[in-house]
Amino acid sequence: GNTDITDPRADQDKIRARIGVVFQQFNLFPHMSVLRNVTLAAIKVHHWSKDRAETRAMELLERIGMRDKASAYPDQLSGGQQQRVAIARALMTDPELLLLDEITSALDPMLVGEVLNMVAELKAQGTTILMATHEMSFAHEAADRIVLLRHGVIAENGTPAEVMDE
């Protein structure tokens, strides 16, 4: 929808509930299985039933190629797998917006493509994504709009062709 998040009358909690966030560190709970990591917020914050949350989580784990890892623990996964689990967790409640903050920066270079492919698939499926990244070739290929920052100030803003081809 069209929600002005700067409007003082806007319900900030409702806005936050419609946003999924993934950080550069995976932030998975080490003592919880993949399935529990993915379902925790849906059950505790959004008050979903365990059955509903687990059904949705298994759909997402299937989508990201991790269904067979549902009972695994984070230390049994590669960095790329952990990041995909973090993305699945962010997608649990079908957010309207997905914020991705340098999600490849903590990964082994061999795993970066795996995560970027997943982001490209999410975009192709219609997910709105705001992504902070240094992966400029990926941004050029996948973005509808690029905003370049220099020292915290917007230096360029436009389509990939406008920004990257200059």
Predicted regions and their residues:
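ABC family nucleotide-binding domain
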Residues: 1-143, 148
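ABC ATPase "signature
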Residues: 157-158
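Short acidic-hydrophobic catalytic motif
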Residues: 161-164
